[in-house]
Amino acid sequence: EEWGEGPPVYLVHGWGGQRAHLAVFVKPLVEAGYRVVAFDLPSHNESDPGALAPGRTTATECADAIAAMIETHGPAHAVVAHSLGANSTVLAATQGAQVGRLVFLAPMGEFPLYLDLFAARHGFGRRIRSGLQQRLEKRIGMPLHETNMTWTGRRANYPPLLLIHDPDDPDSPHAASERVAAAWPGARLLTTRGLGRLAHYRILRHRNAIRAGLDFISHRAKDTNVAEQPNPSARFT
């Protein structure tokens, strides 16, 4: 889907999501003079099945889809991405996609760490966890650590980056975003507070997170220490 006129801003949802999950950004971006492009990643919602099977895809396949959308609709002024969509966006940039400014909400900055969490939740031991990694690496055609944003960012020439993340997020560790911010020249990390066990998804509706993303896209980034704090339990620090 597409709305508005002006420099394109792409909305990229996360794993198991759909384009509507970032719909809250559409109206303010259009009002700010941007053309907004949103789409479903392979095997998600209304998109065609991925190469693996219906309902299954990989970060690299999603990266190919993002690169194809940017090639079709024009170089991005910015990309707003959530969760796995953030990793795939940087992978697309390593392929030459012009991604512009990046706003990443609860990104999976280190996919091996996510695999550790998955294995722990399901009670998998070291052998099964190692087997899962080998299968994933075979599917994506590269070592899993090469999907880490600290690795792919360098290959993408470190586009301007704003990370927004909550320490309560159980699905994508905040610590990974801290490491990405430390390793990515010029990157900024805004930390929300108090979003609870559903932080990975609540951040998509967090008023200050949305405002910070819009300001960053429009080159109006504010100091995190003076961000408006209408709700002390959900503030930036």
Annotated model-derived regions:
Residues R19, V26-P49:
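Conserved alpha/beta-hydrolase
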Residues A97-M142:
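Hydrolase active-site cap/lid region
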Residues P170-A176:
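Conserved alpha/beta-hydrolase "acid-adjacent" motif
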Residues L195-N208:
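Catalytic histidine-centered segment of alpha/beta-hydrolase-like enzymes
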